[in-house]
C-alpha cells in the first residue's frame, strides 16, 4: 500500500512543480508587498533548518514561534520541521507571564520572534539565555536576524522525511480559563486536516485554478 504524503512531501512536490510561481505574499507597509516563490520559500527554510541542526538540539526538540501570521512564520515552521524539531505555537497577544510559562513548560530550545503588537510588554517573559532569532518585520531586538543567518548558511540538502507519528506542533491554548494547555498534533494529523481544508476550498474555487487564498 502506498505511503500517504505528509506536509513536507507536499512542500517539496510543489517546489518542484511550481518553483517560480508565487507562494507567499507579505504586506510590508505603505501599500507595498513582497512576493516569495516556492523556490525562495523552500530555500530560506532549508538554510534556517541547517542553522537549527547546527545547534545540536535533541531530535524532536521544541522550537517556539511568537509572531502574528506572516510569510516568515510559515518559513520558520517549515525550517523547524525540516530540522527534525517540533513547533511550539504561542498566541501573539499573550502576556509576559504566559509566554514564560509556555516556553518553560514546553522545554523550548529556541524561539523565533516575529511581527508583534505588544512586544514591549512581552519581552520580560523570555528566559535569559534562550537562543532567539528575529524574523523580518519583528520589533527591534538584540537577537540575531533571520536574514543574517540565511545569508551565511548553506541550505540543508535532500527531501527531508518525517514520520506520521512525529509531533509536528505543540499548540497551547490561550489560557483564558486557566493555565494554558499544550495540545499535541502529529504530522499525520496536521496533514489530513490540511487536505480536508483544501478539499472544501476546491468545492468553491475548483481544483485547477490560479486563485491564491
Question: What residue spans do the PLM features occupy?
Answer:
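Conserved AMP-binding/adenylate-forming core of the ANL superfamily
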Residues: 24-70, 74, 78, 95-100, ...
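Conserved structural elements of the adenylate-forming
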Residues: 45-47, 164, 183-205
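Conserved AMP-binding A3 loop
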Residues: 35-39, 168-195
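ANL superfamily adenylate-forming
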Residues: 30, 110, 117-164
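Conserved ATP-dependent adenylate/AMP-binding module captured primarily in the ANL superfamily
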Residues: 92-123, 152, 193-213
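Short beta-strand->loop structural element characteristic of the AMP-binding/adenylate-forming
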Residues: 64-66, 73, 77, 81-112, ...
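A short N-terminal helical cap/helix-turn-helix that marks the beginning
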Residues: 2-25
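Conserved pre-ATP/AMP-binding loop-to-beta segment of ANL
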Residues: 19-22, 153-172, 179, 204-213
